[in-house]
Amino acid sequence: MALWGGRFTQAADQRFKQFNDSLRFDYRLAEQDIVGSVAWSKALVTVGVLTADEQLQLEEALSALLEEVRVNPQQILESDAEDIHSWVEGKLIDKVGQLGKKLHTGRSRNDQVATDLKLWCKDTVTELLSANRQLQSALVETAQNNQDAVMPGYTHLQRAQPVTFAHWCLAYVEMLARDESRLQDALKRLDVSPLGCGALAGTAYEIDREQLAGWLGFASATRNSLDSVSDRDHVLELLSDASIGMVHLSRFAEDLIFFNTGEAGFVELSDRVTSGSSLMPQKKNPDALELIRGKCGRVQGALTAMMMTLKGLPLAYNKDMQEDKEGLFDALDTWLDCLHMAALVLDGIQVKRPRCQEAAQQGYANATELADYLVAKGVPFREAHHIVGETVVEAIRQGKPLEDLSLADLQKFSAVIGDDVYPILSLQSCLDKRAAKGGVSPQQVAQAIDYAKARLA
């Protein structure tokens, strides 16, 4: 059933109809459309368009339809309706007859779809927040179990300074906490209802829009009808949040892909999140992580597409805005799936501590400690930096780590070096000295774990 047509003397070309129709993707707004329609029916009672009995009939029919949709949402796609609004109205008329045609009084699909989409976004943000916190908890648990797993930290993919696997996990907890904060901020801006703004100029009926917003679970009603039906900031904001969140997950995936290589060998992934090769029987591929990394580009593309769609649109509603949903649905679905998959990866991960320790002892990751030692002996840092660089060259020439050089060898580069240097060069000393807030010392890592656990409790 079309919601328009009186103005037209010819039927739409079937090719145009297929091009124009949006039911194949906006069917996902069915529950929100029905909930919004129930609230609108109540508002129409307050202005005398519907009687209380009529409203009750409509609400009962809409509630029945809501249950049918929850049981079998795919039934919607069997229809040739233009969009979800047409489908809901058609089904309502099937149930209550002519009374169903009164429901759209004073309402436009412009404020209707804006309301539906905001309701859907609120529901989806709640799911994303839950998945985000579940992943944070998984990272904190993994950190707690690996506080003593020493491994190399990297800059430029070169071994830099020793860290722990726990400290690495907690870095991603911080990123996910920022993602959580962004979603919570977005939820605040989402919490205003556009229903009752009509096509663009507001409704002609003196409906209490604040009361209507409350019925729908919004904190308040929007203040400008023209903006309300044109606004898709919430779509851009959530796509931006998803893009940033997926960048974090992509980096998480890339780190673990590297840690899982034969060359690094720091972790082993569970069989549950890996796959094999059709040709090479020895292969165990990190497909879950590679897909997380790959899907990041898909989400970034949705943000870029939506920015380009909106940038040249005049106020108020334009059909271009129908393009807001597919990218948003796909991006948030993808982000949600990747959050769940990242948690599953952690669930079965094995940290190979001996190999991590071995790698941390290689690559002269304790060179900074030697420089700090020289500074403590009164050598200016820039001079100490140069001395240690020369010392590393000598250690490489001899094929030894710094701590295996003889005292005589070390004193060739600085006479202030004494026997007390050797304890300083141990991995444990490297960790213990990083005791300022946010550092990798065991005490700081333990405090960070306790803080994260309390925040997530």
From Swiss-Prot:
The catalytic activity of this protein is classed by the Enzyme Commission as 4.3.2.1
Q: Give the protein's recorded name.
A: Argininosuccinate lyase
Q: Which CDD domains match?
A: Argininosuccinate_lyase (cd01359)
Q: Where in the cell is it found?
A: Cytoplasm
Q: Which InterPro entries does the entry mention?
A: Arg_succ_lyase_C, Argininosuccinate_lyase, Fumarase/histidase_N, Fumarate_lyase_CS, Fumarate_lyase_fam, Fumarate_lyase_N, L-Aspartase-like
Lineage top rank: taxon: Bacteria
Which pathway is this protein engaged in? Amino-acid biosynthesis; L-arginine biosynthesis; L-arginine from L-ornithine and carbamoyl phosphate: step 3/3
Which BP terms in the Gene Ontology apply to this protein? arginine biosynthetic process via ornithine; L-arginine biosynthetic process
Q: Which UniProt keywords are present, listed alphabetically?
A: Amino-acid biosynthesis, Arginine biosynthesis, Cytoplasm, Lyase
Please state what class of enzyme this protein is.
lyase
The UniProt similarity line reads: Belongs to the lyase 1 family. Argininosuccinate lyase subfamily.
PANTHER family on file: ARGININOSUCCINATE LYASE
Give the catalysed reaction(s), semicolon-separated: 2-(N(omega)-L-arginino)succinate = fumarate + L-arginine
Name its species. Citrobacter koseri (strain ATCC BAA-895 / CDC 4225-83 / SGSC4696)
* GO cellular component terms, semicolon-separated: cytosol
What molecular function does GO assign, one term?
Answer: argininosuccinate lyase activity
Does the keyword section mention RNA-binding?
Answer: no
